[in-house]
Amino acid sequence: MSRLDNRAYYDDFAGWYEKERHLPYHRMLDDLEVELVERYATGKAVLEVGCGTGLLLHRTARFARHAIGIDLSGGMLQKAQARGLHVMQASATALPLATASVDVAYSFKVLAHIPDIQGALREMARVVRPGGWVIAEFYNARSLRRLIKAMKPPSAVSETTHDEHVFTRYDDARAIRSYLPPELTWVATRGIRVITPVAKVLEVPLLGTAVRWAEHRLADLPGARDAGGFLVACCQRR
C-alpha cells in the first residue's frame, strides 16, 4: 500500500478532523490530555507540537502564560488560526523557536507518525528551558488498543484517504526510553485509554459514565497506566 507524505495526509484529513471530536470518546481523550498538560503548564510558556486545528491548544491557552502551536499541515492550521491561536507551519524535526524559549513542549497523537522520532524529541528538548518539561505521547505496542487496531479495517479520514495511508509506529516503554535524548529524564507516565475496548462504549448510558470514571482513575495508577493505548512520557529537561 502506498503511503502519503505527512503533509499531504493531514491536509486531506483537515476537512474531516473535527467531524467526530464532539463524541464522548474523543472528549475523554482530550480531557485526559489537557488535564495532564495543566499540571505542568499553568502560568508557563507552552508549545504544542502538532497542534492540528487547535482543539487542545485553545484549551491550553486558557491556563498557560503564552501558548504557541506548530503543525506541518496548512489545512489544519487554517482552522487553528480561525480560533485566534498563535500558530506556525513547521516540521517537528525543525522547530522555528529559539533554544530554551519555552517551559513546556507537548505532543499528542503526532510523534507516532514521525519516522525521525529521535530528531523530533531532540528538537522538543532543545526549545525547553532547563527544569522544564517535554510531554510526549506514543502509541503503546502492548495495549488492547493495538490489538483491536490490528484486527479492524482501516478508518477513513476523508473521502479518498484512510489511516493506513500514513506512517504509524507502535512502541513499548523500552523503545521510548531509547529515543529520549540524554538531557531528558522520564519522570512520570500517564496511560490513556486503559480499558476502553471500542469508542462506542462511551456512548452507552451508565456504562459510558462508568468507563470514563475508571479511565480517569487508572490513568496514573502504576501497573494499570502501562496498559494504556496511549503512553505519555513526562520528561524533565536537565
Predicted regions and their residues:
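Conserved class I S-adenosyl-L-methionine
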Residues: 1-41, 44-52, 55, 59, 133-158, 200, ...
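Class I SAM-dependent methyltransferase SAM/SAH-binding core
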Residues: 53-94
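A conserved beta-strand element that flanks and buttresses the S-adenosyl-L-methionine
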Residues: 106
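A short glycine-rich, Lys/Arg-flanked "PGG" loop and its adjoining helix->strand segment in the class I
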Residues: 118-130
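A C-terminal cap/extension of S-adenosyl-L-methionine-dependent methyltransferases
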Residues: 155-156, 178, 188-238
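Acceptor-substrate binding/catalytic loop of class I
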Residues: 155-175
